[in-house]
């Protein structure tokens, strides 16, 4: 083969390699539509995921200094557990059923699987997405109704859980919904992060989803409570949102450092 043909073949291989991720993503989107529309498939997957999460939870040894939501409950603390998208998969274990009244889950079809897994763990779900203040789209997604429902659960003396950042929005940037819940309920937000020494980060996903593996070390970090005054104005709400963003980042970095031996 002459040099020109070799160059052409090389370029074709490079184009093919570049196209594969996009083709794979497109294929997954087509398959996913059928999965989320099938109640039977969703139920089976939910049970498999729930079993996997229990395996991860029970086979990872907590490192020294690891926190616990159960310990906070025993001390009489109540509030809103907050985590980032991509690090929320262990929520059913971190926020134990019986103590956690409800977790907000997106109204999207994809989130139906998350809701099923939470319900298998004994945690009720309220469907909605919390966006920024005066976000009409958030209201249309049931965010306002879900926030009212979460407030009622908090009024009963139970914990609730929310994913702080907005689905398919800017990752690791807290939305205003969770801050609003803290203001109207009078209950603080607790930044929560979980990490294991054996894990896989899906770099191509929008939220850098973390898959935790069993048989390693685990750490939970529960940050200091973040209070929002009932009369907080727009500037105070934004300050609380930015504070929560920073504290969730800090908790996530701390949990990773603890299991990686860098604490």
Give, region by region, the residue ranges found by the protein language model:
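Membrane-anchoring hydrophobic helices of lipid-metabolizing enzymes
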Residues: 2-99, 122-124, 239, 246-263
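Membrane-interfacial amphipathic helices and adjacent loop/beta segments
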Residues: 43-64, 102-145, 151
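Amphipathic coiled-coil/heptad-repeat helices and related helical stalk/stem segments
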Residues: 65, 87, 143-147, 174-175
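Structural motif
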Residues: 80-82, 104, 161-163
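Solvent-exposed loop/turn segments at secondary-structure junctions
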Residues: 88, 110, 167-170
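Catalytic-site beta-strand/loop segments enriched in glycine and acidic/polar residues
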Residues: 146-181, 185
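A cross-family acyltransferase "interaction/gating" segment
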Residues: 172-233
């Amino acid at each position: 083969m002459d040099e020109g043909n070799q160059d052409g073949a090389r370029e074709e291989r490079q184009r093919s390699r570049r196209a594969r991720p996009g083709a794979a993503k497109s294929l997954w989107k087509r398959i996913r539509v059928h999965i989320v529309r099938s109640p039977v498939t969703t139920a089976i997957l939910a049970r498999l995921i729930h079993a996997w999460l229990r395996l991860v939870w029970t086979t990872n040894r907590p490192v020294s200094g690891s926190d616990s939501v159960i310990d906070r409950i025993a001390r009489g603390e109540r509030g809103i557990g907050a985590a980032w998208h991509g690090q929320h998969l262990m929520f059913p274990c971190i926020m134990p059923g019986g103590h956690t009244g409800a977790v907000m889950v997106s109204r999207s079809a994809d989130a139906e699987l998350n809701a099923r897994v939470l319900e298998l763990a004994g945690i009720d779900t309220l469907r909605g997405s919390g966006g920024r203040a005066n976000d009409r789209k958030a209201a249309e997604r049931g965010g306002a109704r879900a926030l009212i429902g979460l407030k009622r659960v908090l009024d009963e003396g139970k914990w609730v859980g929310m994913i702080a950042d907005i689905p398919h929005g800017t990752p690791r940037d807290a939305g205003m919904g969770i801050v609003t819940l803290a203001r109207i309920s009078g209950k603080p937000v607790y930044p929560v992060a979980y990490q294991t020494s054996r894990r896989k980060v899906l770099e191509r996903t929008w939220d850098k989803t973390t898959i935790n593996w069993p048989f390693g070390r685990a750490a939970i970090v529960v940050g200091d409570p973040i209070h929002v005054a009932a009369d907080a104005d727009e500037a105070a709400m934004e300050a609380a949102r930015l504070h929560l963003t920073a504290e969730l980042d800090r908790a996530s970095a701390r949990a990773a450092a603890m299991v990686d031996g860098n604490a």
